[in-house]
Amino acid sequence: MKVKIELSGGLELLFDKKKVHEIEFSDKNEIPLKDLILYMRDNLLKERSELFVVDDTVRPGILVLINDADWELFGGISYNVEDKDTIIFISTLHGG
């Protein structure tokens, strides 16, 4: 199973300044979005995890899109990510 992760709005700075990550899970057909977020925290995130994850979900102020649609349309954190899905994380938190 391959999943494409896109980061913007400054989140890419926490992930080694990479906007796009391709992840492959060879032993799975689907993975809960919550598990994907925790995988990202544990394996891809390079600094300041509190700016991405709070209480095992994305921090408030981060917009999550699944294949270009709001994740709430798919059940939010309980969505099962499938092969070839694109998950986009956009930070709406900015300094002023």
Swiss-Prot record:
Where would you find this protein in the cell? Answer: Cytoplasm
Q: Which domain of life is it from?
A: Eukaryota
Pathway, according to UniProt? tRNA modification; 5-methoxycarbonylmethyl-2-thiouridine-tRNA biosynthesis
Q: Mention one GO biological process in which this protein takes part, according to its record.
A: protein urmylation
Query: Which CDD domains does the protein's record reference?
Result: Ubl_Urm1
* Residue list for modification 1-thioglycine: 96
What does the PTM comment of the record read? C-terminal thiocarboxylation occurs in 2 steps, it is first acyl-adenylated (-COAMP) via the hesA/moeB/thiF part of the MOCS3 homolog, then thiocarboxylated (-COSH) via the rhodanese domain of the MOCS3 homolog.
User: Which SUPFAM superfamilies does the record associate with it?
Assistant: MoaD/ThiS
Pfam families in the cross-refs: Urm1
Instruction: Kindly list the GO CC terms recorded for this protein.
Output: cytosol; nucleus
InterPro entries (alphabetical): Beta-grasp_dom_sf (IPR012675), Mopterin_synth/thiamin_S_b (IPR016155), Urm1 (IPR015221)
Cross-link named Glycyl lysine isopeptide (Gly-Lys) (interchain with K-? in acceptor proteins), where? 96
Q: Name the UniProt key words of this record, in alphabetical order.
A: Cytoplasm, Isopeptide bond, tRNA processing, Ubl conjugation pathway
User: Which terms in the Gene Ontology molecular function aspect does this entry carry?
Assistant: protein tag activity
Among PANTHER family, the record links this protein to: RURM1 PROTEIN (PTHR14986)
Task: Give the matching HAMAP family.
Answer: Urm1 (MF_03048)
Task: Quote the function comment for this protein.
Answer: Acts as a sulfur carrier required for 2-thiolation of mcm(5)S(2)U at tRNA wobble positions of cytosolic tRNA(Lys), tRNA(Glu) and tRNA(Gln). Serves as sulfur donor in tRNA 2-thiolation reaction by being thiocarboxylated (-COSH) at its C-terminus by the MOCS3 homolog. The sulfur is then transferred to tRNA to form 2-thiolation of mcm(5)S(2)U. Also acts as a ubiquitin-like protein (UBL) that is covalently conjugated via an isopeptide bond to lysine residues of target proteins.
Similarity remark = Belongs to the URM1 family.
State what protein this is by name.
Ubiquitin-related modifier 1 homolog
Record gene name = urm1
